[in-house]
């Protein structure tokens, strides 16, 4: 049996402000840092240990990983950062308040943008200062790989090559891995691992800062998955993600 642990970053400043974040590089709140600390403590107390860790190039995920590993006394393990683990790009919605956007465009339209599989939000204009092509961390990427918006389908297509080429071979080699990433990049991976249908994926919400453990067969098919946390607390945190457009 192989074990993989996923964790969505702790609450970010824009999570607290209920804004669409995407590739915008915002930090953790004090609550988010505390969530990461608690996750690290829980993992350590439950006997988990890791050989390598993976994260995005966005600081809310990087800092979550650091806090978790520090609490586990494992900051020395190899850490791999890659843009393919970034959050889904929310296009022209980035920075907008979710509830206010729902008031302007309607709950149904915002739900489609947030949770449909293959419909992206309106794109950024190429000259928009939020265009990731202006960010030095993406300077060496093929311009065709830099999104101006993404659907979840696009995020799956971005994430899976890195999974197949880099992450999965390490799991098959017996490495114990931790992935600290984002709500939608993790939804993309969970969709793939669990074989969730394109329509059903709309109902999947991943809470911040709670470890999600996968026990995998030798061929990496899931045996089971579960959150490390109080079930009632996990349910409340998950529902809170679903209710963001109502706040």
Swiss-Prot record:
PROSITE patterns: PG_MUTASE. Keywords: Gluconeogenesis, Glycolysis, Isomerase. SUPFAM superfamilies: Phosphoglycerate mutase-like. Pfam families: His_Phos_1. It comes from the Bacteria. It catalyses: (2R)-2-phosphoglycerate = (2R)-3-phosphoglycerate. The active site is at residues 9, 87. GO terms for molecular function: phosphoglycerate mutase activity. Pathway: Carbohydrate degradation; glycolysis; pyruvate from D-glyceraldehyde 3-phosphate: step 3/5. CDD domains: HP_PGM_like. Substrate binds at residues 8-15, 21-22, 60, 87-90, 98, 114-115, 183-184. One of its GO terms (biological process) is glycolytic process. It is an enzyme of class 5 (isomerase). Its EC number is 5.4.2.11. The keyword Isomerase applies. Homodimer. Catalyzes the interconversion of 2-phosphoglycerate and 3-phosphoglycerate. Belongs to the phosphoglycerate mutase family. BPG-dependent PGAM subfamily. This is 2,3-bisphosphoglycerate-dependent phosphoglycerate mutase. It comes from Geobacter sulfurreducens (strain ATCC 51573 / DSM 12127 / PCA).
């Amino acid at each position: 049996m192989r074990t993989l642990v996923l964790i969505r970053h702790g609450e970010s400043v824009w999570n607290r402000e209920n804004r669409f974040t995407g590739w915008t590089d915002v930090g953790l709140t004090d609550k988010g840092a505390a969530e990461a600390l608690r996750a690290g403590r829980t993992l350590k107390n439950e006997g988990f240990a890791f050989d390598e860790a993976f994260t995005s190039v966005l600081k809310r995920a990087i800092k979550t990983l650091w806090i978790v590993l520090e609490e586990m006394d494992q900051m020395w393990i190899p850490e791999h950062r890659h843009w393919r683990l970034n959050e889904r790009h929310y296009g022209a919605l980035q920075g907008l308040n979710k509830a206010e956007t729902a008031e302007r465009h309607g709950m149904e339209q915002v739900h489609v943008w947030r949770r449909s599989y293959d419909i992206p939000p309106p794109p950024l204009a190429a000259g928009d200062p939020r265009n990731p092509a202006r960010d030095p961390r993406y300077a060496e990427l093929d311009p065709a790989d830099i999104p101006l918006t993404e659907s979840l389908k696009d995020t799956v297509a971005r994430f899976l090559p890195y999974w197949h080429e880099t992450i999965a071979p390490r799991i098959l080699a017996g490495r114990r891995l931790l992935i600290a990433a984002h709500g939608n990049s993790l939804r993309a991976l969970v969709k793939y691992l669990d074989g969730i249908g394109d329509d059903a994926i709309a109902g999947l919400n991943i809470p911040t800062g709670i470890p999600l453990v996968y026990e995998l067969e030798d061929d990496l098919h899931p045996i089971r998955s579960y959150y490390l946390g109080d079930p009632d607390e996990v349910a409340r945190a998950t529902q809170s993600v679903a209710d963001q457009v109502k706040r």
